[in-house]
């Protein structure tokens, strides 16, 4: 633990006692880094085993420090959703991720880093409040949905002092290598281009063998500072991005084999997860294709992961959280109650 102070800003969970923490964790390359986050504890008396914990991995906000959820002026859709979990009697811990809320670049989709952040904030929570229990469930949305999968794989070895009971992943991004291929070859402007370039910058930042000066065009290099100074929503609505031909940001015949390799290594298709897993996906998701999540589910099932997939008719990228609130609460409560039988959708 580096620091802890009461947290009452606009993004604090209104139904909890909130603490802003800065804590030690490990980067994707093994460096010690300082990461911020918020610990939200229900009001009242904890159960005998201590507060059950939900560690939340948030969706895409940006690669710059000011994009941290703890810096939001008002609660976003995820934080409003998390208030319900506090009301249900869970301590909710939310990492900001490396490079968001603290100095440095956020290694977007270098998922080992996000997994470390998401696990170690549980350690930070237990360090400041002994009434927080050792049993926890990891949950996440979008970028965080993918991070939750990576955290579920490494948690038993990374944090053997904690007891991970399950994982819930909402609309995880599982096809990032396809995203890279699309932005390198497409001449058609696309609103999601900043997200693709955030992946390029974030993943490249963890591998010294990748030199973006040899991969990106002068135009692409000129746009990099925006990735480090603006948040995702701002860039996605900016003409500087949404009028650009994606392939113009890359050099012709650039040496991208290492970058492609690293993108593939950060896809969750072949993870070995040994706790119950619940995937939630809306059919009207405008960012993550239901077909991609179905393929992810099939891959994980083939790997022996005890996985369930719920596909929610008409739910979009954000509304899938609210639409599945009651069923996911029931699923999580069963994990804390010690239920071992999971409704399998692997066939």
Segments predicted by a language model, with ranges:
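Alpha/beta-hydrolase active-site loop
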Residues: 108-130
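Primarily recognizes the serine-hydrolase "nucleophile elbow" in alpha/beta-hydrolase
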Residues: 123-193
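Accessory cap/linker subdomain of secreted extracellular hydrolases
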Residues: 170-268
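Catalytic-loop region of hydrolases
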Residues: 1-46, 301
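C-terminal catalytic histidine-bearing segment of alpha/beta-hydrolase fold enzymes
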Residues: 251, 255, 260-261, 287, ...
